[in-house]
Amino acid sequence: MSLSRCPTDNSSSRINSSVPLINSSSPATPPESFDPQVFPSSLIHGDNLLPQDDQIASDPRSESNSCNGNTSSSLPCTDSYQYPLKHSCTPSFLRKFNESIENVSYKCLDHSPPDSVPGDFSISLVPQRNFLYSHSSLPPKIISIDRNNRIKLDNSISSNSDNFPPSPKVDTSNTVSPGSKPISEDLEDLNLQSIVQTFEDLPEGIQSYAFFQLLRSCNRQSMRLLLNECEPLLKKDILSNLPFSIVQSILLNLDIHSFLSCRLVSPTWNRILDVHTSYWKHMFSLFGFQINENDWKYANPNLNRPPFLHNDQISDDYFPEIFKRHFLNRKRWLFPSIPPSHLSFPIHVPNFMITSLLLHKDRIITTSGSGTIQIHNAITGVLEARLEGHKEGVWAVKIHENTLVSGSIDKTVRVWNIEKAKCTHIFRGHISIIRCLEILVPSRLIRHGVEIVEPDQPYIVSGSRDHTLRVWKLPKNTDPPYLPDNTNSIDRWEKNPYFVHTLIGHTDSVRTISGYGDILVSGSYDSSIRIWRVSTGECLYHLRGHSLRIYSVLYEPERNICISGSMDKSIRVWDLSTGTCKYVLEGHDAFVTLLNVFQNRLISGSADSTIRIWDLNTGKPLMVLPSNSGYISSFVSDEHKIISGNDGSVKLWDVRTGKLLRFLLTDLTKIWHVDFDAMRCVAAVQRDDQAYLEVINFSGSRP
């Protein structure tokens, strides 16, 4: 390939550019003296030159050199689509930059208009003020490069001058002005290798400038070919060559959006990020999520679950899916893209009192002050069964699999088959109202570093206003019914084959109980808490400290602690390995009726209209959720949320921030109870003179 060039001028050297010479009346800042022998020969001698656009004989665009009568432009007459950079402005970073040439520091200035077309440009290389004169008493020359590839060395700067304006005063008498003919009319072939050599000899900044000017004369097809070749070479894979541990450290600092964006960079990155499943485990913990029974079954379908579940008990490989499930569940509740659906239906409740509410699978179970137990379908609202047998109000109810156990003001405990809607067993023995119930089933736990299972069989424990607790065996589904006639003979009911023993010790009504495995915690109006081993009836601890009645207790088996809330407005955390009080939590202004624990947080509800969240490890308060007025009648919580009822409304809170997200229900006369599962919230409420069950479905479909 050969190109044409202009012959070299004897009086001045040339460099390839397409820029007019800068003519400025302002002298340059004096630098160090200039020695032509140390300046690059490629800039002083014109033996290797880049061609101008109008010198490329082989370009078919040169057939027409006029556009709308303008014959002075060196750019061929073409449309802007074919030549995308034809009218593009020179980027600012190409117009002003610094260069170091042969130990001389130069500031390169382009003084042509930013929107100049190719062929209309000029450059000056101005020596910098802070250059030390080391080579000569004379300062370095200002180098001016014009559009016809000529270089002008200006020696008009005095090194003794004290005033150094920013740009040079250039004598244009020895230069060729824009638009004039080359010095010689003789043309000779210019070898492509010499063009490349000249380009390589240019300073980096001028290379970039010159290359952009060439691109302005390239058509779209040529630019596309260049892009296709260059783009892959300019990309550098910053992950593939790094050690696994460093990549992991980088990824753990990304948010989810950035992490997912990285997966789209390339198939290689996608494969790398697929391997780093520990990222999802890290995010799982960062979001405050906790694995549950379903997660364990998903990851270990053939293994028995450990006594207590922790995030590190499941392999990292399963966490992408586990995180997704928890994250979407949180989003459905806290930030739903589809508004939750709402099903409301009235229920018949004499005296308008719903004493308890349970959401069990697709069934809603309610008990009332009339003694009836109703089972409604949670999807349709249809009444599926009405369990009748208690003579007075039912104040306590528990469920285990297909068995429902109820305790009543009529002093009896009844056992029901849910599917058959039938009472199978009646237990008598208490001489006053049954106020609380618990079902304890064989559970795996760690004691003294050894994994054990206790108790050896399921038990029912009932607490009564007669100051006692009674322990019964939980009947099996295959056991025959036990339905003795009513009698006033207490001795006869002591012979009940399901009766185990009576727990005696409290001196006032047993108000609340909580248990796990073989351990039961009871709270009484006698202001004390007792810890029992259910299978033997032994009282392990008698905990004193509260000054008034106990309204709520909670047993936390993993930490081996229990928590009590009292009418004295305080909460106490007890260490059951020593029987001592660890913390006294104060802040509520009324009696504490509700307690719940999740992970390291204790949540308490009080008649002072507030919900408080505490750090269970330190006993320090974390936040207060104010609820206007009215005592907190009910609340439920999990790793994402708190749902509370008071002040005529049901509210949804973010458990991590304490922020009130929305009102689920408003304009209520009374809220008795709330409950929820993975997809639904159910509330038993009263509007005016009618009781209702409200089902709010967050699954994105009609309940």
Swiss-Prot record:
Region ranges (Disordered): 1-73, 156-180
Keyword Transcription regulation: no
GO cellular component: a single term: nuclear SCF ubiquitin ligase complex
Function of the protein: Involved in maintenance of ploidy through proteasome dependent degradation of CDK inhibitor rum1 and S-phase initiator cdc18. Functions as a recognition factor for rum1 and cdc18, which are subsequently ubiquitinated and targeted to the 26S proteasome for degradation. Together with pop1, required for cig2 instability during G2 and M phase and cig2 degradation in exponentially growing cells.
Subcellular location: Cytoplasm; Nucleus
Keywords from the named record: Cytoplasm, Nucleus, Repeat, Ubl conjugation pathway, WD repeat
Protein origin, superkingdom: Eukaryota
Disulfide cysteine pairs (residue numbers): none
GO molecular function: ubiquitin-like ligase-substrate adaptor activity
Renumbered ranges of WD repeats: 389-417, 429-473, 505-533, 545-575, 587-615, 625-654
Chain residue ranges for the region called Interaction with pop1: 1-170
Cross-referenced PANTHER family: WD REPEAT DOMAIN 5B, WD40 REPEAT PROTEIN
CDD domains found in the cross-reference section: WD40 (cd00200)
Subunit structure: Homodimer and heterodimer with pop1. Binds to cul1, pip1 and phosphorylated cdc18.
GO biological process assignments: negative regulation of mitotic DNA replication initiation; protein polyubiquitination; SCF-dependent proteasomal ubiquitin-dependent protein catabolic process
Organism: Schizosaccharomyces pombe (strain 972 / ATCC 24843) (Fission yeast)
Domain (F-box): residue spans on this chain: 236-283
Family annotation (InterPro entries): F-box-like_dom_sf, F-box_dom, G-protein_beta_WD-40_rep, WD40/YVTN_repeat-like_dom_sf, WD40_repeat_CS, WD40_repeat_dom_sf, WD40_rpt
Gene3D superfamilies according to UniProt: 1.20.1280.50, YVTN repeat-like/Quinoprotein amine dehydrogenase
Name recorded for this polypeptide: WD repeat-containing protein pop2
Polar residues: compositionally biased ranges: 1-27, 63-73, 156-178
Pfam families: F-box (PF00646), WD40 (PF00400)
Name of the coding gene: pop2
